[in-house]
């Protein structure tokens, strides 16, 4: 499974949104109505699934689905 697909799966699962409503351009807060607790849970899930640590500083920069995909792809390489 690609990083993009796995990130989208996590977002759908964690935020309870329809898969059709999620694409790489969506903002977690503005488009997908995530609150601060949702964002914290998303970051924790990304860390667990991708076996990496995301600093608080980096986490604050991850505003869209694509931000997370790009970040994780860079970390994997």
Curated annotation (Swiss-Prot):
Query: Where in the sequence is O-(pantetheine 4'-phosphoryl)serine found?
Result: 36
Q: Which GO terms describe its biological process?
A: lipid A biosynthetic process
Reply yes or no: does the keyword Manganese apply. no
PTM (free text) = 4'-phosphopantetheine is transferred from CoA to a specific serine of apo-ACP by AcpS. This modification is essential for activity because fatty acids are bound in thioester linkage to the sulfhydryl of the prosthetic group.
Entry's Pfam families? PP-binding
User: Where does this chain mainly localize?
Assistant: cytoplasm
Q: Which PROSITE patterns match?
A: CARRIER, PHOSPHOPANTETHEINE
Q: Which InterPro entries match?
A: ACP, ACP-like_sf, PP-bd_ACP, Ppantetheine_attach_site
KW DNA-binding (keyword) present = no
Subcellular location per the Swiss-Prot or TrEMBL entry: Cytoplasm
Q: Could you say which protein family the record assigns here?
A: Belongs to the acyl carrier protein (ACP) family.
What does it do?
Carrier of the growing fatty acid chain in fatty acid biosynthesis.
What this protein is called in its record is Acyl carrier protein
* Taxonomic path: Bacteria, Pseudomonadati, Chlamydiota, Chlamydiia, Parachlamydiales
> Gene symbol?
acpP
């Amino acid at each position: 499974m690609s990083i993009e697909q796995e990130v989208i799966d996590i977002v759908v699962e964690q935020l309870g949104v329809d898969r059709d409503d999620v694409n790489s351009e969506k903002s977690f807060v503005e488009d997908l109505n995530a609150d601060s607790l949702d964002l914290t849970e998303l970051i924790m899930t990304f860390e667990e699934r991708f076996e990496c640590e995301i600093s608080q500083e980096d986490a604050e920069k991850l505003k869209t689905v694509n931000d997370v995909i790009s970040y994780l792809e860079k970390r994997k390489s």
